[in-house]
């Protein structure tokens, strides 16, 4: 072992050892408890960023810890390799998406290896390869045969920039999540998977996920949006037509004053045929923002159709309006408007001078004041004829029953969740395995024609998909008949919804999954990824697992037992303004800063001396040029230092503020550990530790060692507070550095302590600990060493420090035997000079004793 800590030499040597020995390669072993630790697979964008490093370091720490507990640990990695960015990069770099993607994978794979992550690389999965997506295509055809897949023309979120459909979840503030272009509404044929058929399971099984963050479960519950209500049919006056609405507030039904329908509703289109102004308004609605946040805040617009609906209980004639806040995709595309008790309906009614009728009293029994806003609380009905005086639940039931009895109502459970649109009008994705025959019949691609292989040698023009531009690619046959292949490709969430299961059997070629391997490893024991995936990936991930279960491929109900959502990585951001007012962002690595006495940045300049504006800490991003390249940090400080800083600087689920001074601090700590572990063996052989021969000082130090082991074990295993685990190890190291080394028992105790420190640090800093383990005489490789176990006997304290109070005020501290009872503590306390002084001439009225901690004497 060398005297100085040189990570550049140590880390490459240790990584080579892991590679040559297949250290992290695993197979199913029924005799060992399994543990499947998985971080969300990366998109191969070209380079790792610090968000990746944080995610994968957390996963690696957990995996190595569980391995030291003796478990059979699977930690795989792969590549979510399809996706739109590859198309843009291919056009920009005059290449095709495939070579760009494969080159990125090679580069990023090397970066992952340099960080020392303990992956089983034999299970690497690349989702753009036909041997992966063939099974996705096969499964899709099975879902089609089961009636869980269908095609329909529907209004979709269309990104004109990317020329593709976006899921509702991919529309952020009315714009495309990827390119920030304003989203339009467009009617095109789409393939859908019936996630709504599993809505109840997805909702109720959230209760089984005891080790998932409540925030994620709440977001999923809200997204599924189960509601109980009534579907009501209105007759259109002077017509055979009807329209249907769904409401969760039938108790307010007698307050309905108009009906609003979506621009795409059949009644809207019928009325527009003879009304050019209405036709123009409907066209305007097609570009309306569709994200819910926008729907809530945008200006409410509408136009009367001239039609009227007949109120089924009162016979009142209710005007039918087209409104921009009603969407065909939600419910029935029509809503009953109760402006007295719904704020959106109220705003619309005020704008267009429509009647407002109150039908629910205030909590105090008074009539609501509707001059400024709607009264949306539940209460007792009035102005409602025979239903007057009923409370919410009674009113709900009575009006629902009346509608059902008349044949114009039906109690229904509705969901906010919509079926999953999986069609994308792009090239770089898995081809959808469906065909259209000459007579228009749509059929699934036969199994013997799978996979439908995506051609990789293509020329990108940046506008149309090569699949759509090449008519020959689509031509095929079905049972000897000419047929055309589907030229849409799958949403890339399809690939990332089942990759975790394929890791259990990546080379299996007789089916989608090897049931024996899949059911040995699944469910995932620990899943790690960002909270931003709560309602897209994590919902589809759960849905797909239930589909796999119902196909007989897995036996568990949920894909992952425990979920950890790591926080974002932030860094300082700086910019200057050009003469035109444009912000130019400058990398923090190129900025010199001055700080005040509290460490706050008060001045910043770039290399040319230009003064910059400090924009605070923000998420590392290309747009703000404040990303820190992990590779540069690894080359400067070593992978172990970067890993240690990432785990120490913040609780895992909180945001992490990147500070290079913190990285330097982590590096100094590792050097201290290295120095002590180097110097210790240099002093000669170490004898056996004789626990019975330890003096009080040695016992106290050994107690600290084993209390630290207990704390670190709990922090990593149960609490997952990795930063406090590291802090405890650092605190112990400070004590070890000051510990005497005069006797054989001093040295034997330090040996036990250092070996424990190295084992506890191993999940965080595996390269250094691999080397130190050998230097300290550890048996075999530390990769196969057991986790240290705290000695309960060592943690028992011989004595306790008890705080003494008189009438709640501190009057002294005394040391008593650990097993001292209240009487002994009172006796010792009364002998303390300051305590005795405050007891003089008084009577002890009450004794409050917290064993081993505090004695409070209440006197009078």
From Swiss-Prot:
Transmembrane regions: none
Superkingdom per UniProt: Bacteria
Motif 'HIGH' region: positions: 42-52
Cellular compartments per GO CC: cytosol
Main location: cytoplasm
Subcellular location: Cytoplasm
Motif ('KMSKS' region): 619-623
Record key words, sorted: Aminoacyl-tRNA synthetase, ATP-binding, Cytoplasm, Ligase, Nucleotide-binding, Protein biosynthesis
Pfam family, one: tRNA-synt_1g
Reactions catalysed, as given in the entry: tRNA(Leu) + L-leucine + ATP = L-leucyl-tRNA(Leu) + AMP + diphosphate
GO MF terms held by the record: aminoacyl-tRNA deacylase activity; ATP binding; leucine-tRNA ligase activity
Enzyme Commission number, as recorded: 6.1.1.4
Residues the record lists as binding ATP: 622
BP-aspect Gene Ontology terms: leucyl-tRNA aminoacylation
Alphabetized CDD domains for the sequence: Anticodon_Ia_Leu_BEm, LeuRS_core
Entries under HAMAP family matching the protein: Leu_tRNA_synth_B (MF_00049_B)
Family: Belongs to the class-I aminoacyl-tRNA synthetase family.
Name this polypeptide is given: Leucine--tRNA ligase
Species, as recorded: Sodalis glossinidius (strain morsitans)
